[in-house]
């Protein structure tokens, strides 16, 4: 009887730790989702302008798109500090 009770309590500890892990991973995934949503505008702008320029000069368009993406990644956390883009 004692062996069954100890096995039962070990099972409860394992299920408790699993629920803690699940709740912590879900909060981190929502944090990363938040950062993706916050950063998407600056990235989309850089890609769009880069693609427009790339229609005229392919090499220059790629460079301009990369520069604008970098600038967007730097300015977004400054302009929107509540976003997770840092």
Curated annotation (Swiss-Prot):
A Pfam family of this chain: Coiled
InterPro entries referenced in this protein's UniProt entry, alphabetically: HssA/B-related
Region ranges (Disordered): 11-33
Similarity comment: Belongs to the hssA/B family.
Protein name in the entry: HssA/B-like protein 60
Organism: Dictyostelium discoideum
Encoding gene, per UniProt annotation: hssl60
């Amino acid at each position: 009887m004692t062996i069954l009770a100890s096995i039962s309590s070990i099972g409860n500890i394992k299920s408790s730790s699993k629920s803690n892990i699940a709740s912590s991973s879900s909060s981190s995934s929502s944090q990363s989702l938040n950062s993706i949503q916050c950063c998407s505008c600056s990235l989309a702008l850089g890609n769009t302008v880069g693609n427009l320029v790339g229609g005229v000069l392919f090499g220059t368009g790629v460079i301009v798109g990369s520069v604008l993406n970098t600038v967007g990644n730097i300015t977004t956390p400054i302009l929107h500090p509540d976003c997770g883009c840092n």
